[in-house]
């Protein structure tokens, strides 16, 4: 059975939504949950019928969102340090954390090490499009990149799309300010030349192309990726609020909204980041799923499902093998 370490106290809202997410996941799929945190606080939240699937790893401290990620290695009593250490010692198959994302990334890189051929790991996230989903990476691990980093991100994203998203030939693109090969800054142009070696590379793409369903993997540096991610979250929230405001304007619009309620529900589900759970940190020697600090129980449940799928695949070995083809 898969063993998943969960940073049980690292999210913005404390342990309650995290434990609720773990319980929902256990009701859907069997796995062993290792809850990292204060067992005196956590144990009363676990129903007897699920106790057999729960273990505890004591951790007395939480790495604060206000702390610098570079300090994560210093305090070995934090929940995220203990969780990553369990993975390093191969006592678990994956880690899920809604805590400090910088600390998670820093500890995973330093404690677990990078995959062969990878110079920097990348955070990958799923973005909704009009057909299905687009994998965007990097979305925050590396604000400054070299062309070789983006090339490695492309390989990791392509393998992830193939193995986890089940896309046989994922269409891979590079984010730029125009589709033409000559567009972009020096980093983009140099990266484009490297990515031309990849058979599934379809060229440059603009930000709007994330949503048209014609791209499966979009590569960029962590600065641009994070700006895109946060902007999209804001736009989605604003659109639904504008719809609510318009619905309230008249009786007819309220009737129309009532008739459209099933469609609105489907749309909201498709665009809701909680449905996607978390973001895998690709390129480290293990499975680390980074969840949003504001994750509710549904997001934690879905992040755990991501961790299970990742752990059951051989994605890290496949990434190394794929990179080896280009480094030979």
From Swiss-Prot:
Subcellular location: Cytoplasm
Main localization (coarse): cytoplasm
Pfam families named in the record: FA_synthesis
Residue stretches in coiled coil: none
GO molecular function terms listed in the Swiss-Prot or TrEMBL record: phosphate:acyl-[acyl carrier protein] acyltransferase activity
Signal peptide: none
Keywords for this protein: Cytoplasm, Lipid biosynthesis, Lipid metabolism, Phospholipid biosynthesis, Phospholipid metabolism, Transferase
InterPro entries: FA_synthesis, Phospholipid_synth_PlsX-like
Catalysed reactions, as listed in the record: a fatty acyl-[ACP] + phosphate = an acyl phosphate + holo-[ACP]
Protein EC: 2.3.1.274
A Gene Ontology term for the protein's cellular component: cytoplasm
GO biological process, one term: phospholipid biosynthetic process
Top enzyme class: transferase
Record pathway: Lipid metabolism; phospholipid metabolism
Quaternary data: Homodimer. Probably interacts with PlsY.
Classification via NCBIfam families: plsX (TIGR00182)
Family listed: Belongs to the PlsX family.
Role description: Catalyzes the reversible formation of acyl-phosphate (acyl-PO(4)) from acyl-[acyl-carrier-protein] (acyl-ACP). This enzyme utilizes acyl-ACP as fatty acyl donor, but not acyl-CoA.
Entry protein name: Phosphate acyltransferase
Taxonomic source organism: Campylobacter jejuni subsp. jejuni serotype O:23/36 (strain 81-176)
């Amino acid at each position: 059975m898969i063993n998943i370490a969960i940073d049980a106290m690292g999210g913005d809202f404390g342990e309650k939504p995290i434990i609720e997410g773990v319980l929902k996941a256990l009701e859907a799929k069997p796995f062993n949950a290792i809850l990292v945190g204060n067992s005196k606080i956590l144990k009363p939240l676990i129903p007897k019928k699920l106790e057999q699937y729960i273990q505890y790893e004591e951790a007395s401290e939480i790495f604060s969102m206000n702390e610098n990620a570079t300090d994560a290695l210093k305090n070995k009593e934090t929940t995220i340090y203990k969780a990553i250490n369990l993975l390093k010692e191969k006592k678990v198959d994956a880690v899920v954390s809604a805590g400090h994302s910088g600390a998670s990334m820093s500890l995973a890189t330093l404690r677990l090490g990078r995959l062969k051929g990878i110079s920097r790991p990348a955070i990958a996230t799923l973005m909704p499009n009009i057909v299905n989903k687009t994998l965007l990476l990097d979305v925050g691990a590396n604000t400054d990149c070299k062309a070789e980093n983006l090339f490695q991100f492309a390989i990791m994203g392509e393998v992830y799309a193939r193995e986890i998203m089940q896309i046989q030939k994922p269409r891979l693109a590079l984010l730029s300010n125009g589709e033409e090969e000559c567009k972009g800054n020096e980093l983009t142009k140099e990266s484009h030349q490297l990515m031309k070696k990849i058979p599934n590379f379809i060229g440059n793409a603009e930000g709007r192309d994330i949503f048209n369903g014609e791209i499966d993997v979009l590569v960029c540096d962590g600065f641009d990726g994070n700006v895109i991610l946060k902007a999209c979250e804001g736009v989605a929230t604003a659109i639904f609020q504008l719809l609510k405001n318009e619905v309230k304007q008249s009786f007819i619009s309220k009737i129309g909204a009532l008739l459209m309620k099933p469609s609105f529900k489907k749309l909201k589900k498709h665009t809701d980041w909680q449905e996607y759970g978390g973001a895998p940190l690709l390129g480290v020697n293990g499975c680390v799923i980074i969840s949003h600090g504001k994750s509710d129980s549904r997001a934690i449940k879905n992040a755990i499902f991501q961790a299970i799928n990742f752990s059951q695949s051989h994605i890290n070995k496949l990434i190394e093998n794929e990179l080896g083809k280009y480094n030979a």
